[in-house]
């Protein structure tokens, strides 16, 4: 019984991933077709550029998570920063 439940859950997860991937491909094809026809080309390019910028920004924020920030790191209290050693 447990095996059946686990297999059902795994297959549902895999199916969801597959559907997401095919939806992304379909969306890209639709955009390309739309751009190729020339209808609203600048608007569509602008939308694609905004999506790319948002994706790049999110990736940059993920990379910055462990690095130093304005007053120390996220894991370090501000008062332990070197700026406050003389206080």
UniProtKB/Swiss-Prot annotation:
Superkingdom in the source lineage? Eukaryota
| Signal in keyword set | yes
Annotated signal peptide: 1-16
Which keywords does this chain's UniProt record carry?
Developmental protein, Signal
User: What is the official name of this protein in its record?
Assistant: Developmentally-regulated ectodermal protein
């Amino acid at each position: 019984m447990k095996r059946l439940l686990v297999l059902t859950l795994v297959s549902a997860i895999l199916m969801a991933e597959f559907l997401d991937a095919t939806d992304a491909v379909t969306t890209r094809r639709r955009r390309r077709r739309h751009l190729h026809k020339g209808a609203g080309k600048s608007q569509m390019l602008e939308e694609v550029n905004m999506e790319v910028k948002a994706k790049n920004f999110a990736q940059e924020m993920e990379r910055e998570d462990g690095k130093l920030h304005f007053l120390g790191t996220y894991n370090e209290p501000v008062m332990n920063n070197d700026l406050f050693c003389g206080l």
